[in-house]
């Protein structure tokens, strides 16, 4: 994976420099959609075929996203296809997303919950977490029933675990010590 990260970095940085201020988040959505499409092994096998022209691969990938791509993102896709780097596109999307977040002072937060969280409750939770972590957060929720209750929040390399499962583990350690 380090090789893909090394290959992806110049593409992500060049795209970030090319993105107009205020439009980078929209570009990130388009690149993420392209990355999801490029992650498909059948598509990559098709793209690697010497019988397929670069324009055919471009048309297929751009068509599957069902979005009108801005010229800068189109140029990225063309360059990656022509250079045989389509397999690095998911990593380019991840690195570009990280650059956009870093420039806007936002961090990604993954909230693991045993149960679905209502939008209003999530907004309150995010406001509390932003105070706790000292930065703006972009939260996504993933269900994890084995937590029993509560939440576990991961922001970068920081973890806040207030789940029932974690509390039971702490009690187990305390009782067996």
Swiss-Prot record:
GO cellular component: a single term: proton-transporting ATP synthase complex
Membrane disposition: Peripheral membrane protein
UniProt KW keywords: ATP synthesis, Cell inner membrane, Cell membrane, CF(1), Hydrogen ion transport, Ion transport, Membrane, Transport
Name by which UniProt lists this protein: ATP synthase subunit delta
Coiled-coil segments: none
Cellular localisation: Cell inner membrane
Disulfide-linked positions: none
Role according to the record: F(1)F(0) ATP synthase produces ATP from ADP in the presence of a proton or sodium gradient. F-type ATPases consist of two structural domains, F(1) containing the extramembraneous catalytic core and F(0) containing the membrane proton channel, linked together by a central stalk and a peripheral stalk. During catalysis, ATP synthesis in the catalytic domain of F(1) is coupled via a rotary mechanism of the central stalk subunits to proton translocation. This protein is part of the stalk that links CF(0) to CF(1). It either transmits conformational changes from CF(0) to CF(1) or is implicated in proton conduction.
Entries under PANTHER family matching the protein: ATP SYNTHASE DELTA CHAIN (PTHR11910)
Tree of life domain: Bacteria
Subunit structure: F-type ATPases have 2 components, F(1) - the catalytic core - and F(0) - the membrane proton channel. F(1) has five subunits: alpha(3), beta(3), gamma(1), delta(1), epsilon(1). CF(0) has four main subunits: a(1), b(1), b'(1) and c(10-14). The alpha and beta chains form an alternating ring which encloses part of the gamma chain. F(1) is attached to F(0) by a central stalk formed by the gamma and epsilon chains, while a peripheral stalk is formed by the delta, b and b' chains.
InterPro entries per the UniProt record, alphabetical: ATP_synth_OSCP/delta_N_sf, ATPase_OSCP/dsu
MF GO annotations: proton-transporting ATP synthase activity, rotational mechanism
NCBIfam families in the record: ATP_synt_delta (TIGR01145), PRK05758.2-2 (NF004402)
Family: Belongs to the ATPase delta chain family.
Origin species: Methylibium petroleiphilum (strain ATCC BAA-1232 / LMG 22953 / PM1)
Transmembrane segments: none
């Amino acid at each position: 994976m380090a090789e893909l990260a090394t290959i992806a970095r110049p593409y992500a940085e060049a795209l970030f420099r090319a993105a107009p201020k205020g439009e980078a988040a929209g570009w990130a959505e388009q690149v993420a959609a392209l990355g999801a499409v490029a992650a498909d092994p059948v598509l990559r096998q098709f793209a690697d075929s010497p019988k397929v022209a670069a324009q055919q691969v471009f048309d297929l990938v751009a068509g599957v996203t069902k979005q009108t791509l801005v010229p800068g993102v189109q140029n990225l896709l063309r360059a990656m296809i022509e250079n045989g780097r389509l397999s690095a596109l998911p990593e380019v999307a991840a690195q570009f997303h990280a650059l956009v977040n870093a420039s806007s002072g936002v961090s990604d937060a993954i909230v693991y919950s045993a149960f679905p969280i209502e939008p209003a409750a999530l907004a309150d939770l995010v406001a509390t977490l932003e105070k706790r972590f000292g930065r703006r957060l972009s939260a996504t929720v993933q269900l994890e029933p084995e937590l029993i209750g509560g939440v576990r929040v991961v922001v970068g390399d920081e973890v806040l675990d207030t789940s029932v499962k974690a509390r039971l583990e702490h009690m187990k350690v305390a009782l067996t010590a």
